[in-house]
Every structure is written in structure tokens, then in C-alpha cells.
């Protein structure tokens, strides 16, 4: 948690079909002695998570391949090994004159590790907001050929709590890298 990710999420690990909560502890992290993270309360919580893999270097650095951090945002790397598009679970009332856009949050995650590298990692997420609630199931396949990007299949069940003027499902967003004008 911090400047950009202000809400904690509940994390669960699924093993053999059984879920157990994975509690936050500062002992899970290695931090330099002068890190401001040492000043955080012991029950701070998780802001989200990233799935990583060893990148083959001797120093055991890792390569992110999927991230779920902040509101209902998620993203995965492409064939170049870099993040490109990001997505949100839903967008509510974007660009509706006189109405504030709503940003529902993923509040809980259940991560079911793949038993075989060719099988997907399954992530379930609960979505919660003032006007909507729901559940998502993500099938995340990294692929055995690391030159490929991540394949993501998504199932969702959404339930409206009140009328919504404009609802978008998994809208994509990205940053401009370079091109004819820059």
C-alpha cells in the first residue's frame, strides 16, 4: 500500500481445491535499512500482486508477467516482455456529463497455481463498488515459449446495485510510446 494503491485487498492461495488466506507480514519482504516501508504498521496489507518468473540471470532477478494492482486494474506482458495495454474490470459512468466516474475495486483474490507449466494459473477476484458487485475468473497462460505474450481468458458475473448510465466491460488503456508525432 502506498501513494498509488490506497486500499488493501484480501489474498488467498488455493491448494488442492482448498483456499486459505495469505496474511500480510513485513517479514515477507526484504527492504533496505533506510526504507520508509519499515515505518508502516505491521497490518498494512497487500495492495495487489504480481506474478513473476526467474529471468535466467545469476542474480535471481524476476520478470513480471501479470499484475493486479489498484481498483480493478490488471495487465500482462506482451511478446516483447514489456507491459503494454492495461485493463479494468469495469468502467462505470465514464464521460457522463454531471456524473462522477465510479472506480469499483477488486477486494479479494484467490490464486490457484498451475500444476503444470502448460496449464493456466487461475485467479478469481471479487469486485465491489457502490453500484455494482461481481466476480471474475482469469485463466492466465504464460506459454512454454517465452517469446509469446500472456494469454488471458476472463469470465465475469456482474450484479448491479443501482442504475448505471454507462457501463464498460474490461476497457483497455495504454501509454503512447513513440511514433510519427513523438
Task: State where each predicted segment sits.
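Beta-strand elements of well-folded, non-transmembrane domains
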Residues: 15-17, 53-55, 127-131, 140-144, ...
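Solvent-exposed N-terminal domain segments of exported/luminal and surface proteins
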Residues: 1-98
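Short acidic, gly/pro-rich beta-turn/loop elements at beta-sheet edges
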Residues: 21-23, 133-135, 164-166
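Intrinsically disordered, low-complexity boundary segments flanking structured domains
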Residues: 35-36, 107-113, 163, 178
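Beta-strand secondary-structure signal
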Residues: 10-12, 122-124, 153-155
